Regions:
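Hydrophobic alpha-helical segments, chiefly the membrane-spanning helices
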Residues: 1-331
Length: 331
């Protein structure tokens, strides 16, 4: 009886943690079937691989972050929305690059990659500048979306990483071979649109409950659990690519994902609800985000190969960052 009474307070936390994991599974599954359905639709209508790469694939891989951020903002949890984006950008560099290079090294000397990293770095600086205004409002959201439009326009003019474009062509070709019927395509699209919001609601609601129960801020939940969970699709994809010895494409995907997170996800979310910026973000987390962006930019400019030793350092850096967040929040 005594043991049962001791375990009772933790049961709610275990249930919430389980619901968060279920939510992540729904987000990952929903994003995957949404991309598959959209690719199949594009293949049937012979849509340009370039257009598919810039829209369908980019939106699909960032769908978990987008839906979680929108739902967080609507429900009054702006810290989770912004923490999700900032934390995902940090995890993308330290974790999503750090893990696969333990399996196979990643080359940074790729056509057009230096220009993409420059855009990511400039976008990061501009994004942090907007955060220091204290609130991301509709006006700032429009500015971010205008930046996204410029980025996509530049990509449409041919400033697209060639290896990434070839990967999209391969995906389109693979889907086209199956000659899927319209009803199956619509089933995939509909399933993705249903699973994503359900998964997002589980993650946001249960994550908020955990923050209250553990006595830590919603910002920390957004930066850690939520950001890590929404980055799982990118991590799984890069690890799979590493086993195929094709990790070079993953680097361009990480850079593109970080740009998309700041411009599209925050931009769209700000159109729906104003995002108040927690002071904790400005004192520590945005500087970590800028530091890892600068590291990646420098690595690409030097044309160095990111190998196992550097991967270990990246993972240690991510571990220290998470440790600092959790211990700082609990103290």
């Amino acid at each position: 009886m005594d043991m049962a009474s001791e375990l009772t307070p933790y049961m709610g936390d275990l249930i919430d943690l389980g619901l968060v994991l279920v939510g992540f599974a729904l987000l990952i599954g929903g994003g995957d079937v949404l991309v598959r359905g959209a690719l199949a639709l594009a293949a049937r209508h012979h849509v340009s691989p370039l257009l598919v790469g810039m829209t369908v694939v980019a939106m699909g891989t960032s769908a978990p972050e987008l839906v979680v951020s929108i739902l967080s903002a609507i429900s009054g949890h702006a810290d989770i929305a912004l923490g999700n984006v900032i934390g995902s950008n940090i995890a993308n560099v330290l974790l999503v690059i750090g893990v696969p290079v333990l399996i196979y090294p990643m080359a940074t000397a790729q056509p057009g990659l230096a220009r993409q990293t420059n855009i990511m770095m400039l976008t990061s600086i501009a994004f942090v500048g907007l955060l220091f205004l204290g609130t991301i409002s509709t006006l700032q959201g429009l500015i971010l979306l205008a930046g996204l439009g410029m980025f996509l326009f530049g990509a449409a003019r041919g400033d697209v990483e060639l290896s990434a474009l070839e990967e999209v062509k391969a995906q389109l070709g693979e889907v086209a071979m199956h000659h899927l019927s319209y009803w199956r395509i619509l089933l995939w699209l509909g399933l993705g649109m249903v699973l994503l919001p359900i998964g997002a609601e589980l993650v946001v609601d249960s994550g908020t409950n955990l923050a209250l129960s553990w006595g830590i801020s919603e910002a920390v939940i957004g930066l850690t659990i939520v950001a890590l969970g929404t980055s799982l699709p990118e991590l799984a994809a890069t690890v799979a690519a590493a086993f195929r010895r094709n990790v070079d494409v993953a680097l361009g995907n990480v850079i593109g994902s970080n740009i998309f997170n700041m411009l599209a996800i925050v931009g769209i979310t700000a159109l729906i609800a104003d995002l108040d910026v927690a002071p904790a973000f400005l004192s520590y987390d945005v500087w970590v985000m800028l530091a890892v962006a600068l590291f990646l930019t420098a690595a690409v400019w030097r044309g160095r190969v990111i190998g196992r030793r550097l991967g270990i350092l990246l993972l240690i850096g991510y571990g220290l960052y998470i440790y600092h967040l959790v211990t700082g929040s609990l103290s």
